[in-house]
Amino acid sequence: MPSVTDIFDRIYAGFIGKAIGVRLGAPVEPTIWSYERVRDTYGEVTQYLRDFKNFAADDDTNGPVYFIRALRDYGLDATAEDVGRTWLNYAAEEHGMYWWGGFGVSTEHTAYRNLRAGIPAPLSGAIATNGTTVAEQIGGQIFIDSWGWVNPGNPKKAAEMSARAASVAHDGEGLNGARFCAAAIAAAFDLTTIEEVIEAGLATIDPNSLYAGVARAVLAFHEQHPDDWRACRDMLNAEWGYDRYPGVCHIIPNAGVTVMALIYGQGELTRTVEIATMASWDTDCNAGNAGAIVGTMQGLQPGWDKYRKPINDFLVTSGVLGTVNITDIPSFARELTVLALRLRGEEPPALWLEDFERRGLRFDFDAPGSTHGFRTEPFNQIALKGSTAKHTETSRGSLEILLDRLERGQGGRIFWKPFYRRADFDDERYRPMFTPAVDDGQVVRFKLWLDPWNGDGNLRVAPYVKRAISDRIQETGAWHVPSSTGWQDYEFTVPDGDGEGVEEVGILVEYFGRLKFLGRLYLADFSVAGPGKVVIDPKREVQEWGGITRFTWNRGHWTLQNGRIHAHTAGDADAWTGNAYLRDVTVTAEVTPLAGKSHLVSARVQGTSRFYAAGFEGDEAVIVKEDHGTTILARAPFKPEMGRDYKLALTVTGDKLSLAIDGKDVLTATDATYRYGAAGLRMASAGRMSVGKLEVVDR
């Protein structure tokens, strides 16, 4: 049975493998990139086909990050219906998360519409509901990696759980794909050859299925032609090609490519994802699935570096939780390890349980070679890598910062980005949305250790934050020369930003000596913790990603007009901000009802369908709970005037909720359903409202 450390390391390696495969395959995913066109244009793929400022969101990685949250929200025995609720809860309607290709065309779009219409899973994805073509597209296997990772060494259970999860949108051969890929990942924790891993996956599906048939055809061809994957690809095209299977992206031809990449890649990650990419068809899906399996089996390897370094432990997702969308891969691997241990009936480490719902950040650099997404500016004289040369008592590693021949007055920034804007990306794939993961008032702590090689030692550092809209840099402490004899502790409080979000948090470095400085600076135990304050002044925000900076949104039209937020909707609509794990807070907003009956603020928001809200509903003031349906927790007569400004304040402390209007307490209620969540604005029905300043203050 794998140890806790081995589980964590292999999940981390597997997710890196998934991310590498998706990033490598994505540029040639569109169907216009035929097999012949990829071959003639790129020949042998041995590196990324495109450089990215930051790789934007992708449905292949959205699903593994978000759908596993069913185990958080509904427990370890979550049903297919629970996973269906999870789909609804974390996806904004028709932007982000899925390929919104149309009802009856996109399997995920179809399932989402069914769920919205009240058809529960697994009926939402059943052949009886949607027909065989829609039910057997490739999505059955591309979202399920996490179900394998939380079942290390238990392929049978991984297959069962993944099939339940996949049944939200898929059926038939689609479920076979889910079983195979998740079981192969689970088996990869224990097995040492790719042949064994493939057989473990196939053992969980019907041997007479088409999925097993195409896999066996590939394995048989490999026995006869072990050195010619292109001949195998020709066989797949002739006998199992797209012309034989209807729909936009059927699972069977792509299953053949996935197994082909696995067996011809011979258990080596880079070759596996390269074959999956060169083979065309659904390149990011196939390379992503194969990369997840092989990455888990192989574990981290130095030979991955050309693909691993650009990822930098950073992944963008595009659900409705803006801080979750800034995914730190080692931290997510730790979350999955907690779930894996719970499913095995074991108690996770106490600190990891805190991480599971942490209102803040903790980067320990414990995963081999991990960087936690830290960055440098400028790039040419400062370089980063995960290192084991120095570490603290609680970690196997630290961040090694190479400072290469700095002259007097030269330096730069070493930082983590808690917020992203449109300019940080080359495209708008899957429309990610972000809210800052670091807030004013929170405390930042870290350790530094200087290892000077050359120079007169006068290298100084100072902590800082950078603001998101103005690019203003705020130094938050005096300049110091770091210790060269051991770890030195640093601590600062994020200063008031005058209503502007935090885009960078880190350290400034500058050399004040006469001789050129060459050496290393090590950073360890970086954390952001404690209560904070979110202040959003609409005058300081801009419109991006179809919404407003520092907000995620679902339905309605959210714009900036005359220095205020303007919301307009024909049904329900929400906009959210703040950390996904806020607990006891007061959410205050300057709200002006303009039309309609519903004008609310929200707290402990865990998605589109799980939150508390309070404010005006018709001729009443209300406190409500939303849990895929509305429960009124408290109500009182109150008829708001259209066009008049009101200050709404919703306070949640423990299981106590209260609403104040213009500073006067109006309602109280008690409910213990939600312990944490983001905050925001809501209209539960058609109408318009204008909103001025919004504040979210930890209590």
Stretch-by-stretch model annotation:
Residues 386-427, 554-573, 620-623:
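Short carbohydrate-recognition loop motifs
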